[in-house]
Regions:
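Long, histidine/aromatic-enriched segments associated with O2/redox biology
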Residues: 1-182
């Protein structure tokens, strides 16, 4: 992945050698497990970022919108996320992209509900995709079936907060690099 820069944003490329995802209900247990792993890996690896993420409001982003509604399910999810068995040594593995996003909550909160819905392309309360969503809407820019070739991945977002700042960690698992290059 090559970094991207625009007039109002910068998305740097930050490749890493190792990524760990620890999950659990007890934050204290996760902290201790993380500390043990960091100590075990310390001779070879130095942590670049540790993010404490969580489930918010039954799977919603901090903006209040339901997350992951367009994820493939069942066999389609397995096919999107994992290298197929016939691939040999890589069978069962995934290519992963991780993005750490910081939300501008004051800016989003200053929008009307209609403006927020248009920004996402869904109605927050019903989770229905808007027929007249603008091309700049999140759902229009991320429709996996609209890429050539189709760019299906299994996506997972995890809200994070530190002090008064927050956002999401976006994780995408793919069976090849193709979806990430679309």
């Amino acid at each position: 992945f090559e970094g991207i820069a625009g007039a109002k944003m910068r998305l740097p490329s930050t490749p890493t050698a190792l990524w760990l995802w620890l999950r659990g209900e007890d934050r204290g247990a996760l902290l201790h497990r993380s500390r043990r792993l960091c100590a075990l890996l310390a001779p070879a690896f130095e942590p670049q970022r540790i993010t404490d993420a969580f489930v918010h409001d039954g799977g919603r982003d901090l903006s209040g919108y339901e997350d992951g509604t367009e994820n493939p399910t069942g066999d389609a999810a397995l096919a999107a996320a994992f290298v197929p068995p016939e691939a040999g040594a890589l069978a069962g593995s995934s290519f992963v992209a991780v993005q750490h996003w910081q939300h501008s909550m004051p800016k989003f909160d200053a929008m009307t509900r209609a403006q927020q819905d248009a920004c996402i392309g869904r109605e927050r309360d019903s989770n229905e995709e808007m027929d007249d969503a603008p091309e700049s809407a999140h759902v229009k820019r991320t429709a996996q079936e609209d890429f050539e070739p189709e760019a299906f991945v299994l996506r997972r977002s995890m809200p994070w907060a530190e002090g008064n700042e927050g956002g999401l960690v976006f994780v995408a698992f793919g069976h090849s690099f193709d979806a990430f290059e679309a």
